[in-house]
Amino acid sequence: MDSIEESKIIRGAYMVQLHPFGDERGRFMETFRKDWFPQRNWDILQMNRSDSKAGVLRGLHYHHHQVDYWYVTRGMVRAGLVDLRPSSPTYRRTQTIEIGEFNEIGLFIPIGVAHGFLALTDATLTYIVDNYYDNGRDENGIAWNDPDLQVDWGTNNPILSRRDAANAFLRDIPAEKLPRGYGRFPRPCGLFGPITIGPSENKV
């Protein structure tokens, strides 16, 4: 059985340790099941694929009406999370974790937690969401190198899109554009054991 554990750094973010099964033909692995999160009544509405060259950084992005579930199908990325929910007990904490071929983790990101990733190699990220893409109303950004947040990307010179390069620092974003609540994801039922993330789970 796959195991799931809530982040010790950001409340409501979850990491699923995935377990492949292989034989002489190859291997098989479940990467997502709705019943891994049995207390969440959600509808999966869209699945996306993002291909990135090594050195590309995408983010930081956040949503008011969408949760994400990430799985890296090729290569390795360093995922970065920032809790932007004012009423959260982990407000403004940050976390990075390396996920991909050599650390096969599914990453659940709740509403109000900013997220992004640095491609450590050429990489493919697949992710499912519970709302349709809405570029006008629910695609928001914060500067990847915000000095008040200090996300540990491990680089000072990533490849950025023009849009991400123009993202503002958190202190310069109007309060009405930031998440207001704590989010809407309860703890899962106690069906799963803890997982060991290893040295990639690092910064507060």
Regions flagged by a language model, labelled:
Residues 1-105, 123-127, 134-204:
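Non-catalytic, conserved peripheral segments adjacent to functional cores
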Residues 107, 115-120:
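Short beta-strand His + acidic residue motifs that chelate non-heme Fe in jelly-roll/DSBH
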